[in-house]
Amino acid sequence: MAAGLAYNYAAKQVDETVLNALADLADEAQLIDKFQELYNGAVINTGEKRMVLHHLARTQLGDAVVVDGVDKREFYVAQQKKAADFANKVHTGEITNENGEKFTTVVQIGIGGSDLGPRALYIALENWAKANNTFKMEAKFISNVDPDDAAAVLASVDLAHSLFIVVSKSGTTLETLTNEAFVKNALVKAGLNPSKHMLAVTSETSPLAKSEDYLTAIFMDDYIGGRYSSVSGVGGAILSLAFGPEVFAQILDGAAAEDKLATNKNILENPDMLDALIGVYERNVQGYPATAVLPYSQALSRFPAHLQQCDMESNGKSVNRFGEPVDYVTGPVIFGEPGTNGQHSFYQLLHQGTDIVPLQFIGFKKSQLGVDVDIENSTSQQKLCANVAAQIVAFACGKKDENLNKNFKGGRPSSIITGEELTPASLGALLAHFENKIMFQGFVWNLNSFDQEGVQLGKVLAKRVLAHDTDGALKVYSDLLNI
């Protein structure tokens, strides 16, 4: 893998025969050819008739992609520069609040891919940035339409010294606009001018694009889906403000390097595709229903939640890319928590439950802050890493005991991604690895991994409830909740 990472699948239930079969499957399914079509600008999102260009936000793997006379690589780079220039002006004090004072906090208002990915990346690098003197501004996030979410965040910040990023591609997202109004109301009550505290990340055709209510607008387009948008202005604005544009650029560099590895037709030299194919084998041949993502790094505490959206929204489909029902299982359930916390939570089921759940561990040799203590001849970081090694062997080998309550059958497959330290570059490579894994699995299953119709029905019904246009079961549940 890129950026000093390594993918180890020694504890997976695959041998040379299986690997050869998976290599044949990769060729038969034309996985690399389909990836080439994607990054060269083919319409891969067949449902919405759109290209899929998140790779282009970090590097150009193939041909120039031009839409309506606009080179999309140049467009993405221009928006990254716009975000970088804005962040630098905030950091130097060229852009200030009404009293000429520097902003110290940035709050992102968004939901789904506008929250999960950027939040996960911010948390992942917060300690690294502090240790490396690149921490510029504290970042917070408002996502849920639950008013307690916004109220709690606003109560925790100094409004006069806070910037707010409103993220909505369409400019019409109900939850985001509701929370924006919540924030504006708080700013006005504090005697502040909202337009001096807010910027937008949106599309060029959105109502937010040219509004005077914002200090600036950073643009995205229809070709980068929300769950893949951390490398666009959706992640770029807040991460550049929090850590500096140079750190965000390092994330992109790590992702770009991993993307280049993903173009290799040899599955043993393409960790993203190999991981994907082993996952397909576990899902469709072995029949395993879920995958647990287990980072032994507190900095990656929200990374499983981001991958949960990225994977399940992409490949949680029961029809193929032509709209026809499939007669095989597709995407697994994804869940996870950081270790060692998870060991004292759901690992019991993973070790001794009736379902076998494949495991994806992530571990680093060094901590980010470098602050540690030696107790009983080992540091905390050594104890953390020892637990990873122990769990992999325990899951794979188990332990026989005549007392069945203490018997561990083993045979629980796992992989591990290891690195020296979690840095911006290795974080970018890690992000790209899982994005590419999901993409390759979607190709094998012949899915459109880049739409999310499953999100829409609930939105439509919720609007009916709020308009009091209900009957039947919808009315019963509306009345139950006193709407």
PLM regions: where:
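Extended, charge-enriched "interface" segments that sit outside catalytic cores
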Residues: 1-99, 376-385, 396-397, 419, ...
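Helicase-primase coupling helices
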Residues: 7-14, 23, 329, 335-421
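Electropositive phosphate-/nucleotide-binding environments in soluble metabolic enzymes
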Residues: 12, 16, 73, 77-84, ...
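Glycine-rich phosphate-binding loops that contact phosphosugars or nucleotide phosphates
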Residues: 85-92, 100-265
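Short glycine-rich or small-residue beta-strand-to-loop segments that form or flank ligand, phosphate
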Residues: 104-112, 164-170, 290-297, 334, ...
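Short, solvent-exposed amphipathic alpha-helical segments in soluble enzyme
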Residues: 121-126, 155-159, 181-183, 215, ...
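Active-site phosphate/pyrophosphate-binding segments
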Residues: 186-371, 410, 457-483
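C-terminal helical/tail subdomains of lipid-metabolizing enzymes
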Residues: 415-483
